[in-house]
Swiss-Prot record:
Sequence positions that bind ATP: 13-18, 55, 116-119, 176-177
EC number: 6.3.3.3
Lineage of producing organism: Bacteria, Pseudomonadati, Pseudomonadota, Gammaproteobacteria, Vibrionales
Organism expressing this protein natively: Aliivibrio salmonicida (strain LFI1238) (Vibrio salmonicida (strain LFI1238))
Compartments (UniProt record): Cytoplasm
Record-level Gene Ontology MF annotations: ATP binding; dethiobiotin synthase activity; magnesium ion binding
Record: residues binding Mg(2+): 17, 55, 116
Protein name (Swiss-Prot/TrEMBL): ATP-dependent dethiobiotin synthetase BioD
UniProt cross-references to CDD domains, sorted A to Z: DTBS
Length: 227
């Protein structure tokens, strides 16, 4: 079984954290020791206990291995914008060795680590590099989250092409219904199933809130567990 995998999105705000929660819930239901890792998070806040990001806080609460906030999210950036802009505003340089050291530590404490990205696949972390470079270095298998909305078919296929071009395996994809009013939902899913070679791990219905809801029932991990 794999010991870590990366959650990528077709865009920002497609529901990576929603899908991550569902996958973590499903892994927890299988009795595995789970850790969540959000290496870089923008749009964080300082509420008196240090700069923290709401997505990272949520992931930390869902995974069942107890970790400090800094272990889950080593780079919590304030501005809600692209990481390279947010980091530059604070004179922070994203150091891949810090990300790798953190991941190795979580692997040692758990059976499996869910690593959630920021933005889309080619999200820049500096003027010269993207987070995908680090994912390549770590050779992480990828689960792609597709936010079901107008335009998602092109975004999904282009992202899949980019991930494969980078030499990484897409081990599954998750459909997340980000808009309850999206028309032709079934047709979109059918096209994705036809065009995406990787197995569909699940479909998550539209949810205005995911707090205190167990979402593992929406995810089938059989194919992921066989890797």
């Amino acid at each position: 079984m794999i010991d870590a995998f990366f959650i990528a999105g077709t865009d920002t705000d497609v529901g990576k954290t929603v899908a991550s929660k569902a996958i973590l819930d499903a892994l927890n239901m299988k009795g595995l020791r789970t850790a969540a890792y959000k290496p870089i998070a923008a749009g964080s806040e300082d509420k008196g206990d240090g700069v923290q990001n709401s997505d990272a806080i949520h992931l930390r609460s869902v995974a069942n291995v107890e970790l400090s906030y800094d272990e889950v999210n080593p780079y919590a950036l304030l501005l809600p914008t692209s990481p390279h802009i947010a980091a530059a505003a604070e004179n922070i340089v994203i150091d891949y060795s810090v990300l790798s050291k953190g991941l190795a530590s979580l692997k040692a404490k758990s059976d499996i680590v869910l690593v959630e990205g920021a933005g889309g696949w080619r999200v820049p972390v500096s003027k010269s590099d993207c987070l995908s470079t680090w994912v390549q270095q770590e050779k992480l298998p990828v689960v792609l989250v597709v936010g079901i909305k107008l335009g998602c078919l092109s975004h999904a296929m282009l992202t899949e092409e980019a991930i494969k071009h980078d030499g990484l395996d897409i081990v599954g994809w998750v459909a997340n219904r980000v808009n309850p009013g999206t028309e032709h939902y079934a047709d979109i899913i059918e096209m994705l199933e036809d065009k995406m070679p990787a197995p569909k791990l699940g479909e998550i219905p539209y949810m205005p809130s995911i707090k205190r809801k167990s979402m593992g029932k929406y995810i089938n991990l059989d194919s992921l567990m066989e890797i």
